[in-house]
Amino acid sequence: MSAVARVVERVRDLSTPEGPGRAHVCRPADSRGTVVLGHGAGGGLRSLDLTVARDVLVAAGWTVAVVEQPWLVAGRRVAGRPPTLDAAWVPMVAALMSGRSRLPRPLVVGGRSAGARVACRTAAELEADAGLLLSFPLHLPGRPDRLRDAELALAPDPTWLVQGTRDPFGTPTELAPYVPRWAEVIEVSGAHSFPKGAGPALVAAMTRIAAALPG
């Protein structure tokens, strides 16, 4: 049975300058805070690492919101450019954290792949208290000369990264020189998308992170 089987998932429609977005919110009765996660450019909301992160964090008492970018809600197959992703993400997270139905702080921002990049670029604007980056894409496959280390440097303090040992977008070894001193990398056997067999290792990684998150 899923760790969130007893928690109702509520879907919230969210307005953005880039079109309608959506959030899938799981909120336990007594919440330690909120983790908002974004999906990757492939658009998978049910990737293994996102699913495990949600389940483990909710079981540990965190409210978790998995946010759909407008391009995915609209049924498009190609993700928007980084500026449009940021322009949609910021008001969606702000809406979740404000108003009569606001989710509780502290706020942890993150996501997988492209979603992790968005979370880093916008963390300061959203006054995030911590970060959770899954499969951070340091570079395109075969292009280690074009790094996204400047984005990684914007990750909030503290931040945790869960990275596949064979990720063609950047292995833990490749990440090491660029990881901020306030961030920790947890290695999990796998590539950019984790196989089902990585489930136990991902659960262990997320359990460790859940215990360390500020809240």
Where are these regions (language model features)?
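Short beta-strand immediately N-terminal to the catalytic nucleophile in serine-hydrolase-like folds
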Residues: 106-111, 134
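Catalytic histidine neighborhood in serine/cysteine hydrolases
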Residues: 65, 180-193
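Acidic catalytic loop of the alpha/beta-hydrolase fold
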Residues: 165-169, 192-194
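A conserved short beta-strand
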Residues: 127-139
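Gly/Ala-rich beta-loop-alpha elbow adjacent to hydrolase catalytic centers
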Residues: 111-115, 119
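Serine-hydrolase catalytic machinery in alpha/beta-hydrolase-like enzymes
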Residues: 12-106, 118
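Short beta-strand/loop motif that positions the catalytic acidic residue
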Residues: 154-156, 161-163, 167
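Catalytic histidine-centered segment of alpha/beta-hydrolase-like enzymes
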Residues: 190-203
